[in-house]
């Protein structure tokens, strides 16, 4: 028929992508807001780090003094491939789908359309969870380990703002100076990374040590001076707002999101917190780091030619035989890039 629509055509698949709601994630959506897609498999970035030089005083008859330009460093990254897929077999489409009314009378074609939406949602959710994990790793460790089938490498962003407290200086220790630590570390980011951090994200244990500290409790209980306010409330995506410190000026959060680690020890996979319990992150609330997507390349069934697409996601489908089945796969090349070097700080505090 002239008006018959193939639900697996590229046009229809693109519409499915637009209609499927995204999984919102705190780190990716808050800190990596400069989203860019590239037509190449590699992403090149010129990094320019400024300084605090001031213009010189000169005599009117001597003339000006040259202010030499700063150099730059070009970093080249190759976004890794993420390529989950699912299989639709004919026998699945002849029977009722989960949640379908017993007497709905849905045709196999209608079931195929519904299952396509469900499959894409599953693939997209898995890909988005991986993007969030990558974004957190880039901030917490300054690296992204790319470990999978046939790949084992590490992308290193050169983070140097890493602190570790030892012995009695740890939060909860007899010589702990939590407020002094935060003041020194916010200054360090301002001086070395040229960024005003206004946010602290604490791991579970770090948060407990912070609020159990006698000096912190005394400061927050000072009725003569407004040095902070504790007003916890839950926010979307597993984030909880704890309150605000006035000196240093920081909004306090905990992020309770977890991930399923089945690659470190495949024989004993476990669920882990994205933010380690004993760590804190000091960061600006609007750093506008880059979320880069490399080009997606695949063979088009109709022409048999390689096709390159400049997009964050490619959803495609193809048929295999013996047994007959339709494959639905998603391809993406995401890479969160914290392109402002040392504009945040991470610390192991307990």
PLM feature spans:
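Assembly/oligomerization interface modules of large self-assembling protein complexes
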Residues: 33-102
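A surface/extracellular/periplasmic glyco- and lipid-processing/surface-interacting theme
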Residues: 165-180
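Sequence/fold signature of self-assembling virion shell proteins
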Residues: 217-350
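Phosphate/anion-contacting hairpin/loop surfaces
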Residues: 51, 171, 175, 305, ...
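Ordered core of a single globular domain
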Residues: 179-239, 243
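Long, contiguous amphipathic alpha-helices that act as assembly "spine/axial" helices in icosahedral shell
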Residues: 81-160, 177, 181-208, 324-331
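N-terminal alpha-helical "arm" segments
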Residues: 1-43, 337-350
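Extended, non-catalytic scaffold segments that flank or surround catalytic motifs
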Residues: 43, 53, 152-161, 168
């Amino acid at each position: 028929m002239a008006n018959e629509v193939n639900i697996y055509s590229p046009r229809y698949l693109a519409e499915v992508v637009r209609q499927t709601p995204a999984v919102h994630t705190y780190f990716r959506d808050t800190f990596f807001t400069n989203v860019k897609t590239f037509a190449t498999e590699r992403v090149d970035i010129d990094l320019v780090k400024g300084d605090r030089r001031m213009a010189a005083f000169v005599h009117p008859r001597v003339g000006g003094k040259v202010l030499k330009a700063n150099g730059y460093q070009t970093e080249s990254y190759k976004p890794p491939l993420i390529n989950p897929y699912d299989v639709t077999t004919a026998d699945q489409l002849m029977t009722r789908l989960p949640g379908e009314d017993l007497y709905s009378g849905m045709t196999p074609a209608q079931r195929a359309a519904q299952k396509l939406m469900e499959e894409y949602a599953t693939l997209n959710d898995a890909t988005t969870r991986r993007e969030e994990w990558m974004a957190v790793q880039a901030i917490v460790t300054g690296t992204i380990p790319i470990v999978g089938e046939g790949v084992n490498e590490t992308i290193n962003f050169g983070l140097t703002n890493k602190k570790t407290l030892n012995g009695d200086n740890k939060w909860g220790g007899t010589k702990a100076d939590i407020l002094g630590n935060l003041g020194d570390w916010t200054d360090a980011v301002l001086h070395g990374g040229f960024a005003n951090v206004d946010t602290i994200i604490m791991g579970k244990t770090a948060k407990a040590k912070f609020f159990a500290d006698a000096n912190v409790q005394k400061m927050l209980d000072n009725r003569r001076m407004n040095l902070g306010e504790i007003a916890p409330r839950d926010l979307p995506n597993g984030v909880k707002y704890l309150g605000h410190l006035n000196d240093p000026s920081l909004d306090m959060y905990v992020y309770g999101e977890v991930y399923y680690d089945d690659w470190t020890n495949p024989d004993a996979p476990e669920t882990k917190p994205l933010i380690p319990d004993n760590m804190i992150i000091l960061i600006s609330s609007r750093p506008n780091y880059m979320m880069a997507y490399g080009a997606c390349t695949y063979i088009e069934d109709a022409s048999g030619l390689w096709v390159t697409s400049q997009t964050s996601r490619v959803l495609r489908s193809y048929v295999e035989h013996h047994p007959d089945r339709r494959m639905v796969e998603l391809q993406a090349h995401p890479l969160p890039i914290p392109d402002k070097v040392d504009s945040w700080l991470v610390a192991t505090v307990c």
